[in-house]
Amino acid sequence: MLLQTIPSFERIGDYATNLEELGEKLATEGGSFSEKAKQELEILTTAVREILDTTIQALSENDSELVKTIEPLEEVIDDMVRLLKDRHTKRLKNGSCSVTSGLIFIDALTHLERASDHCSSIAVLMLARDNAEILANHYDYVRHLHEGTDKHYASELRRRREQYVDQLYKL
């Protein structure tokens, strides 16, 4: 199972490199983000740091309970990215953000979201190790979770939305 996680960790590293390059591009081109965009990005990066830390901890400690907290957080990160892309598109349309900075912001959101997607993949691999049904069809497992019929998942999802998405709405 550990070998199966290597490609996901490699991709996460690639996204980190891409984010660094976006930061360099923003600096070289003299671009900047609005204060609101910076605040939004800070909330999102906090969530992504948490999912990365949780994934590493769950894997290193072989913690099957901790691993179950990853998918709800990943779904919340997806929700946050959708919201932030919509907000940023409005800023672009009303001229409060330059095209260059706006595209960099959107690219950064995409890289952060994809890193969290790989954390979800690692979590599913960990759960599949002890569950033949998940191993046989992990897509059905994730779809079932997203349908909201798992009480633990629904509770964790609600908690994570309160923790992160609510902060975005307060901005």
Task: Locate the predicted segments by residue.
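Cytosolic, long alpha-helical scaffolding segments
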Residues: 1-171
